[in-house]
Amino acid sequence: MGKIKLCSLFIYYSVLLFAIIIMDNLEAPGIMLRIIYLFSFALPILMFFPQHFPAMLIAYMSVGTNHFAFTYFPYDMNYYPLLAALGIVFLKRSSVKSRPPQILLLFSVLILFVDIITNDRVESVFCSFLTLILLSVYLNYQSHNQKVFFVIMLCVMALAISFIYLTNYKDFLVIYSRVDSGVERGGWSDPNYLGCTVGMGVMAALVLLMNRATSNFFYRLLGILTVCISVIAMVLMASRGALLSLALGVFYLVLMSRTSKKNKIVVIACLIGFTLYLMNSSYVELLQYRLSTESNDGGNGRFWIWQFKLDAFFNSGTIFNFLFGYGYNGALYLGDRGYWAIHNDFVALLCDYGLVGLSLFLYMLYYPIKITNNENKVIVIALLLYLILCCCSLEPFSAGRLPFFGFYLFILCIAKSKSLNYKI
């Protein structure tokens, strides 16, 4: 494709992204406007670069659904499998198509089976798994350009969300303080999901910075800007889980790298110093508020919830519930003490889909490590460590939050590739 067409596509999708960023309406756009936007978004990339559709969809969808305003991207996960399936038609022209990992197929069948039996309907978590399966067909594991493009789009996603947050910080505080507001945009109203989504872009930026094949000025600048701006936004978001997940993921990545000890010490010292500076600045009102709320239960509220839910799971129900769980959102109502959010994907999946479901999820997380080569193993483990730590304080997979499924797809893309020529 000529440079003129490439520049035209770049300008076109920049305008589409800008149209999302500047939205400030608190009422959802009409269905026709949403349909027109989605087709305008999907058709050009599918016609010219279908292999880049997964990265584009995950990035733009994450920005659109993590906005404080309503945007053109639907919050209902039922639409995304249809969009992904539509794009596969364009892949027929290409001989490069991948088979979805069997673990994803098996896990999605289990989820569908349990949800139909327990809830008599298909739930959003299955739609997200189905979208992940369909998007995995697009991957060409031998294409270096596809992996680099995925990294770039995750960086763009983090920068866009951070910019929206930093320029609308007061709007977020108003939404967060209204417990009864009923905000549909859960990612925006919950600083934990918002922070972890931005953290994905930071991890991707580090991949970009550590890759010898992407060492030109543009990639360096994009990576540095993503790390600096996104970390500032994450501190302001005051998500303790997101900050801890990012810190440990980065620490492992630096610690296991092949760079000199001197460089490791310098990098870690800079990260610690930068974080401490932000934590002691005057822009952490929300973090101070959230920390002060922990004094009521000594900071052990989540551990109490996990213990209560696990006791209820193992001491009630039938053998079917023990093996296959209570279905989507079953963990929320498990026990006799009312509605409680779990704040842990492992506990939630155990209660929702039983020991079988939890076992499949654990193998799904191990699968990228199993298939990767030695040169990519450090980066794959670091990315998985970040994702696993996010799952320890949130419920991204059991709740069907598509951005986290997209990040897992990115990890698969890295794991199945040949040597990426990383400095690590």
Indicate residue ranges for each PLM-predicted region.
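N-terminal signal-anchor transmembrane segment
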Residues: 2-90, 113-115, 387
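Transmembrane alpha-helices of multi-pass inner-membrane enzymes
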Residues: 14-20, 380-390, 397-424
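Transmembrane alpha-helical segments and their membrane-water interfaces
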Residues: 41-46, 83-98, 106-164, 254, ...
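Hydrophobic transmembrane alpha-helices and their immediate junctions
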Residues: 100, 247, 255, 263-264, ...
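Alpha-helical transmembrane segments of multi-pass inner-membrane proteins
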Residues: 109-113, 148-175, 189-256, 363
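A membrane-periplasm/extracellular boundary helix in multi-pass inner-membrane enzymes
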Residues: 162-169, 232, 257-294, 313-315
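Flexible juxtamembrane loops connecting transmembrane helices in multi-pass membrane enzymes
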Residues: 178-187, 271-308, 333
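Long extracytoplasmic/lumenal interhelical loops at the membrane interface
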Residues: 293-353
